[in-house]
């Protein structure tokens, strides 16, 4: 069920993109992304990179925490009614997926708190790799120019981040932090989670200002295209 719903999410968003911009070839763009990006932990490893099944499920909870927050932010920010409905349904699905993985991990052998924290922090850190930046590059580069126009990871990451931070609000961050906290055995509104939310939100506001300035400079130089968000 989880896998089918994730596929449906992609199909629904692809359909909306085609209606919003008929010139955008989603299939070719997605194929280019798949051809150009492979998660580092998929290379040469047939086993669990988290060390255990519970570790894998914690990592999945982290992912679902982020996607729930992300689609909730899009839902609250957009005024386009079809997109609002689509991302609202997706946000609800992602929350249920988080609950599924959380329930499944409870049946697995327990890990120490520090081990769970390390797994969660490691999965959060993977969001800083090429995945999102390269997705932005593929989505914003003419299909015939992908692989020809240079891929500037740093510029693409900043451009993507700028769009994300424009729609993110404190309540979205608090939800994500709370869900991650529960996944590793912490209280979602405990002092650690609250402190982390405040600290991260302060960093978010700083990065938003910095990213918007960087975007303006890039646009002025005719650099990274800014028309679409990945």
Give the ranges of each region predicted by the language model.
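Non-heme di-metal
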Residues: 1-230
């Amino acid at each position: 069920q989880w896998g089918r719903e994730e596929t449906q999410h992609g199909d629904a968003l692809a359909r909306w993109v085609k209606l919003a911009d008929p010139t955008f070839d989603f299939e070719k763009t997605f194929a280019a992304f798949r051809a150009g990006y492979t998660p580092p932990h998929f290379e040469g490893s047939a086993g669990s990179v988290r060390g255990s099944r519970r570790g894998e499920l914690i990592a999945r909870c982290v992912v679902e925490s982020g996607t729930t927050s992300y689609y909730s932010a899009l839902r609250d920010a957009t005024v386009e009614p079809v997109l609002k409905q689509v991302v609202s349904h997706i946000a609800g699905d992602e929350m249920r997926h988080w609950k599924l993985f959380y329930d499944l991990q409870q049946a697995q052998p327990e890990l120490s708190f520090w081990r769970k924290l390390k797994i969660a922090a490691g999965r959060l850190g993977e969001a800083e790799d090429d995945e999102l930046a390269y997705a932005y590059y593929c989505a914003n580069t003419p299909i015939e120019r992908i692989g020809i126009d240079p891929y500037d990871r740093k510029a693409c990451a900043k451009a993507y981040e700028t769009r994300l931070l424009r729609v993110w609000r404190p309540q979205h961050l608090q939800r994500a932090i709370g869900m991650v906290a529960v996944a590793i055995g912490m209280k979602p509104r405990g002092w650690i989670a609250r402190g982390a939310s405040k600290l991260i939100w302060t960093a978010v506001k700083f990065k938003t200002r910095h990213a918007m300035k960087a975007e303006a400079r890039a646009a002025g130089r005719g650099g990274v295209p800014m028309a679409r968000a990945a």
